[in-house]
Amino acid sequence: MKTHLLALLSLFCIGTASAQTPRDERIARAVERMDDGDYDEAARLLESVLAADPKNFLANYETGYLLYMQERYEEAVEVLRRIKRKDYPPLYQLLGNAYDMAGDRKRAVKTYEKGLRENPDAGRLYLELGNIAYAERQYDRALACYRRGATVDPAHPSNYRSLALLYAISTEPVWTLVWGELFMNLERGSGRTSAMSETLARTYRDNIRIEGDTAVRMTFSRNGRVAREGLRLRIPFGTAVFEVAARAALTADGIPDSLTLD
């Protein structure tokens, strides 16, 4: 939550912290209270801002966020849908998520798609469309959404993470190594990074077999399809890309780009 607050404040406070207004400072304290789980105090601070400035974007957005965190999704929708800010993708993301959690997945998808029409390079919105496709077992569509999100917004780490996890359940786990390493280089020191490190280690363990003193068998790429719960989707890569992909993954985190086996 602190990260999203900094992003919001940057819209209003360009340059130095001294540019922040007392209202911004109260909103910042409200987010700190949310981080601490003190939702009542966060609500009080936000209400004090809105009493003086009912159209304050930050205060309204954070109020919607607070309601979402409290699992009051219908109320979050009512607050967020009143905010008029076409150029801020996180607003569409949060509103869409609130619709989805309130049980209106169709409206959630429309919200993400509307946000992308206004902000075509919003990788976070492709991420949410991919997540819905994944939840509905439309794995080919999920793959396309995550890849598009990584293409238009390469600095947003979550699409790389989702791609790595999707390929981890496929017969092309070589791409788990590539996307996973990219994710870990963008997002460092988080719980998600630790989990991805474990995923990569497991991918190596599951796909490298020592078959003798001088023989190693690698099975990172097999038949170009992803399988999950009996469903399959086509992957536009085959075994020919293994060497390039493996080198990219191995060099991304300082591991030597060539290996010599005795």
Please annotate each region the language model reported.
Residues 22-23, 57-58, 88-91, 123-124, ...:
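Helix-start (N-cap) detector for alpha-helical repeat units in TPR-like alpha-solenoids
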Residues 106, 173-177, 189, 201-226:
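Alpha-helical linker/edge segments of TPR/alpha-solenoid repeat scaffolds
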